[in-house]
From Swiss-Prot:
It is found in: Plastid, Chloroplast. This is Small ribosomal subunit protein uS3c. Its main location: plastid. Keywords: Chloroplast, Plastid, Ribonucleoprotein, Ribosomal protein, RNA-binding, rRNA-binding.
Length: 218
């Protein structure tokens, strides 16, 4: 039953850390969560509009948010930050202004930092975006999956499982196709597994992409 639970939540506190660090009163908790979601959506939309990468991948691995009384620190982990950093500091200033307008935070300042991750294709979010781009360009799903696995092998991962569900190749009946390389021990809590669930809209309908990457064992 290891696949039934979210692998990130299952390992929280052992091999996985929190992506949002802040505390508030219980009555304001839902507002804080909504604000986090707004910040993440705003950053993703900005990156989508302002970066044109040949592979069609935005390259955001994760966004970490730390909140203090007068400051919101946002760290964007990216696989390909070059297009965004070329506009620096104008690009980051523009993003800070957008976030302040979106969140109506007059009393709080935004501090945005961009960090490049060493092996972009060892991250499931970037890999899922790559597969989504291939599927939109009508590349065969098997070819897209195999190419994605080849890219992760270059990142020295110990195992990967890719699953695509929906009306694959425009077939009438929805089905689930998956492929696995190496070990993916979903039951082992000390196994560091990175996971991503991604939705892609194609001309035939919506497809769901799930990726599990086994990085290391602690």
């Amino acid at each position: 039953m290891g696949q039934k639970i979210n692998p990130l939540g299952f390992r929280l506190g052992t091999t996985q850390g929190h992506h949002s660090l802040w505390f508030t009163q219980a009555k304001n908790y839902s507002e804080g969560l909504q604000e986090d979601q707004q910040i993440r959506n705003c950053i993703k939309n900005y990156v989508q509009k302002n970066t044109k990468i040949s592979s069609g991948v935005e390259g955001i691995a994760r966004i970490e948010i730390q909140k203090r009384i007068d400051l919101i620190q946002v760290i964007i982990f990216m696989g390909f930050p070059k297009p965004l950093l070329e506009n620096q500091p104008r690009g980051i200033e523009e993003l800070q202004t957008n976030l302040q307008k979106k969140c109506n935070s007059v009393n709080r300042k935004f501090n945005i930092a961009i960090t490049k991750i060493a092996k972009p294709y060892g991250n499931p979010n970037i890999l899922a975006e790559y597969i989504a781009g291939q599927l939109k360009n009508r590349v065969s799903f098997r070819k897209a999956m195999k190419k994605a696995i080849e890219l992760t092998e270059q990142a020295n991962t110990k195992g990967i499982q890719v699953q695509i569900a929906g009306r694959i190749d425009g077939k009438e009946i929805a089905r689930v196709e998956w492929i696995r390389r190496g070990r993916v021990p979903l039951q082992t809590i000390r196994a560091k597994i990175d996971y991503c669930s991604y939705t892609v809209r194609t001309i035939y309908g919506v497809l769901g992409i799930k990726i599990w990457i086994f990085i290391d064992e602690e």
